[in-house]
């Protein structure tokens, strides 16, 4: 089997993080980037080992039929609309969190993906980071006892600057 072909929709901060992670895999390659923000595309190219095809709209990417896996890393409120088109491909999907931004879209997601033949995964890649993976292993082994509660405080600026400040003043 050849390399798994990834298409990344949204080449901002999270899209670039996925590119860097895909670069660590032996049998995987990014074959396409999709973003209407040219500066984000150019930044993503710096992390790539190859020269992928570039698309400004996800429907054009879908029509090209070049990917085995689609990663949706666009502004949160756009995930459901892109997903409605992407599910026609029956390819594997990785969708950045949050999957949806309202309850209505969650129910719609459940309805349109019922029986979907590909793998659908909401990105929770931190669980594979070595410190987190070790922590999970320790919990599962019982070495710290029966866990009752767990709390994490994240020490970073919560609203990174994004294209058009979509994460600060969005729908």
Predicted regions and their residues:
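Nucleotide donor/acceptor-binding cores
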Residues: 2-4, 118, 145-148
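Beta-strand-loop-alpha-helix segment that lines the small-molecule cofactor/substrate pocket
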Residues: 62-64, 68-76, 80-127, 142
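Predominantly a Rossmann-like dinucleotide-binding segment in NAD(P)-dependent oxidoreductases
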Residues: 126-171
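Local beta-strand N-terminus motif with an aromatic residue
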Residues: 30, 51, 67-70, 144-147
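Short, conserved SAM-binding/catalytic segment
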Residues: 43-51, 108, 112-115
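Conserved SAM-binding strand-loop segment of SAM-dependent methyltransferases
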Residues: 52-58
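Alpha-helical elements of Rossmann-like donor-binding domains used by nucleotide-donor carbohydrate transfer enzymes
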Residues: 17, 43, 60, 69, ...
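N-terminal Rossmann-like dinucleotide-binding module
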Residues: 1-49
């Amino acid at each position: 089997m050849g390399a798994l072909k990834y298409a990344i929709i949204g080449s901002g901060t999270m899209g670039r993080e996925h590119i860097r992670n895909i670069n660590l895999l032996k049998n995987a390659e990014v074959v396409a980037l999709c973003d209407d923000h040219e500066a984000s595309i150019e930044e993503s190219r710096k992390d790539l080992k190859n020269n992928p095809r570039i698309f400004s709209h996800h429907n054009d990417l879908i029509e090209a039929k070049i990917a085995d896996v689609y990663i949706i890393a666009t502004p949160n409120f756009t995930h459901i609309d892109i997903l409605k088109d992407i599910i026609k491909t029956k390819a594997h999907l990785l969708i950045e969190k949050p999957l949806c931004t309202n309850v209505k879209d969650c129910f719609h997601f459940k309805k349109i993906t019922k029986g979907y033949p590909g793998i659908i995964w909401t990105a929770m890649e931190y669980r594979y980071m070595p410190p987190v993976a070790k922590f999970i292993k320790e919990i599962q082994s019982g070495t710290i006892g029966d866990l009752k509660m767990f709390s994490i405080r994240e020490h970073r600026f919560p609203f990174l600057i994004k294209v058009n400040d979509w994460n600060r003043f969005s729908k």
